[in-house]
Each structure stands twice: as C-alpha cells, then as structure tokens.
Amino acid sequence: MLNSLELEGRPQDTRVVVAMSGGVDSSVTAALLKSEGYDVVGITLQLYDHGAATHRKGACCAGQDIHDARNVAERLGIPHYVLDYENRFRETVIENFADSYASGETPVPCIECNRLVKFRDLLATARELGAAALATGHYVASHRMAGGSRALLCAADADRDQSYFLFATTREQLDFLRFPLGDMTKPQTRELARSFGLSVADKHDSQDICFVPTGRYTDIISQLKPNAMVSGDIVDLDGHVIGHHDGIVHFTVGQRRGLGIASGAPLYVLSLDAANRRVVVGPREALKMHRIILRDVNWIGDGALDRAVGAGLELFVRVRSTRKPQPAWLRAIDGRYEIELVAGEEGVSPGQACVFYDGLEGQARVLGGGFIARAMARRANEIAAQNGTPAQPLAAELRG
C-alpha cells in the first residue's frame, strides 16, 4: 500500500526531511506532512553571510528566514536543524555566477543551487538521517509512473510554475524528491498557512539571486572578477564602433535600455564578446534566433537520450523562465545537441537554460534540458529558400 507520497509504508513509519527556507511554501509543506502523520524533520541551509541581508525582504535563507523556519518548526513540534553551507554555496554557486557573467553569459544561479547544493548535498544529508524522501516547497509536481520511476511535471498553478529551475534534476534525485505543493495554487498555500496558524502566512515571496543584498549583482562580480568591469566598445553588426561601455557584465542579450547610444531606431544587445570586451548591438529583427547549441544536457524523459532523439525529436522548449514553451526540434549533430526553434525566439542568451517539455498546456512533463552555449540565426541558404532569393552571407550569424 502506497501512502500519499507514493512510498511504501504508513506515514507514521516514514521519515521525511523538509527543506525549510523560512518562507510560506516550505513551511506549509512541513505542516501538511506533519498533519498527515509523517515523521518530519526540518532542515534550513545557511547559504551565505547574511549580515548585510538580514533586514532585506525577499532574500532566501537570510538571518530572518532562519529565525522564521525555526519558529515554524517549534509551532509544528518537529526537530529543526540549521546547516552551514556557506563555503559550498560560495564555491559552487556564487563563484560560478561571477565567472559566467565575466564570460559574457547571463546565468541562472537558482538552477545551480538546486543542482549542486540542495538536490545533492542536502539530499545526501536526508538519506543519512534515515529519510525516505526529501520534500520541498517548489511549485512543480512529480508522479509515479507504471514502472515505478517518477516523472517531473509543471505545477498546476502556471503563474508559479518552477519547472524551468529544476530541469537539471537527475532521475535518481527525482525518485527521492517530493513536491507536495505541485497541485496547489499560491492562494491555496497561503490559506493553508493561516489554517495551520503559521506566522509566515503573509510573508513576502523570495526572489532570485538571494546572495545579492543590495540588489546589484555587479557588486558581487566586481569583487570576484574585477577584470569583468573593464571598459570596451559597443559595435554594430558590421563592427563599427558606435559607443563605449563600463563592462560587459552590465548587459544581457535582448537589452534595450541603458545603452547610452543616440540612434534613430531602437537598438538591442545582440551578443557579448567577452574576449574583446565588445557589446554587439543591432535592430530588433536581428535578435531572432532559430538554432541553439546546448551544453550539459540532462535527460529525464523515457529511455536513453540518444535513442529518444534519433533523427530528431519534436518537443517544446522554454528559453527563459518567464516565457511559455515553444515548438522545437532536438537533434544530435556532430557529437553535440542542438535545438531548432520552429518560429524562432528573441533574446536567446548564453548561460540561460533551454528546458524541454512534452506539451504546451496544463501540467506538461519536463523531459530535461541544457544550458545555452550559443544561439544562431538560420543559415543564409535557409532564408533564401524561404524567400525564393539567392543566398546572401548573414552578418554575425553566430551569437555568443
């Protein structure tokens, strides 16, 4: 007989570790499991020096958050532990974040935190404590499939769906993880928090880049990678210098504001050339990319990745967390994986994730994904074939 977490055994005989950030979502997760009779243990990770962020709203795992998590644990009558992961977090997330920006990418630190800290080290700690599962307050769902393995699904609340940030979860991790809020909406979660009498029921939601107390990510980069703040040129697609900048870390692909260039038509950041400290700008139509080269691809769909891809796999991809999935093809070419975007996408930035889904609507299944290494416009001969005109060289076909 399976319990509500789709595990063998009665709830009272099943230990579950809950990752408690001090926010309403993880607090309700702990409260729900406790109310169902599970043996719940709360763990909070201290991820960075929170002195400067103690009074900042929306910072995950800052001093106030640890205090809130402890209060919730006391309210629920569950054991609670705070683990110092500052060094691990700095080495695997913060330093990688700075390196990525310095190389001209736009990173997603929450993915790295989930992949390298929460779902690796914390999961290992949960096993050491004898837990049968690690539960989090993420808005995603996971369901047991016929063969016993688990599928990762989008949240029922599309506005809160966090599947983009969890694409790098491995199959082994997915089998151990549980997401009790996946079929709920945020208002329902807050209402449950009130019904449980939790002090965090109306607490502000946490924000990305939790380790930037001032809200200025360039402060972190200037400390760790001062060379990334070196000035350089802003150039057009033909390489003509049309302006100057104070460091490529101030820019991201698709950016329009803050260029400091007088132009008759709007200009957008098309790519960042870190080696030459150049920011390439151009018209909006030059932003549309149709091909993406991926790195560090993770596959959690059925079977082996190469067999699933075959000559080409039709799926849907999301290239930014705020965008809806779009139709695409995944192909294996010359020992690497590439995405062909059927309709093209603007502002495809190296360093962001490209996440695979099996559908557009509802609780689509997450099939995996990879990080964007490069994005390209269609080849000149493809455009010529579409327009019925002779092929012409494409200026700056390669972005990133």
UniProtKB/Swiss-Prot annotation:
InterPro entries: MnmA-like, MnmA-like_C, MnmA-like_central, MnmA-like_central_sf, Rossmann-like_a/b/a_fold. ATP binds at A19, M20, S21, G22, G23, V24, D25, S26, L45, G137. Disulfide bonds join C113-C210. Coiled coil: none annotated. CDD domains: MnmA_TRMU-like (cd01998). It is an enzyme of class 2 (transferase). One of its GO terms (biological process) is tRNA wobble position uridine thiolation. It is found in: Cytoplasm. The keyword Cell inner membrane does not apply. The record marks H138, Q352 as: Interaction with tRNA. GO terms for cellular component: cytoplasm. Catalyzes the 2-thiolation of uridine at the wobble position (U34) of tRNA, leading to the formation of s(2)U34. This is tRNA-specific 2-thiouridylase MnmA. It comes from Nitrobacter hamburgensis (strain DSM 10229 / NCIMB 13809 / X14).
